[in-house]
């Protein structure tokens, strides 16, 4: 496995990209907002989306942080398109959905991402947790994103153990034939 050193932002100039990381609190939300701001500064029209947000009420705190970092608001935030699935219990998406008593609507998630892609040059879709987090009882987040052919932005950290987690995650993406846009 080799790691390229390139201008990551340039690889993200168009399309839908899925932002994942080594685990919860790896820095995905900050990286998503920062990348969006960098792309905005380069003249791209950018939207961010939180695929599933758990442990929240009627809004996504991650989307709010994206907007603060980007220095913009988006009308799609008010329409619920940028945070289509919100769950109250702080857990993996599949467990939070079960506790809240409603399933995750995968078709709706895809529709929201595609609707954003119609209006913006770049859509950064932030996942919850790491690649192997169950989105539903039968579907891992990584497999959902791969099925959409979304390239990945992978976020790691400097904390102890992160090299191991990063290598295992990157190998999982490689085994699935996933495109990697950036490693941060």
Q: What is each PLM-predicted segment?
A:
Residues 24-26, 53, 129:
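Short, glycine/acidic-enriched loop or turn micro-motifs at the edges of active sites
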Residues 1-21, 25:
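Extreme N-terminal, non-catalytic leader segments
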Residues 12, 16, 30-103, 107, ...:
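N-terminal phosphate/diphosphate-binding loop that engages ATP/GTP or pyrophosphate donors
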Residues 122, 127-184:
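Conserved catalytic-core segment of NTP-binding enzymes
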Residues 14-18, 46-47, 122-124, 151:
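Residue-level preference for the first positions of well-ordered beta-strands
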Residues 27, 31, 105-108, 136-137, ...:
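Short secondary-structure boundary/capping elements
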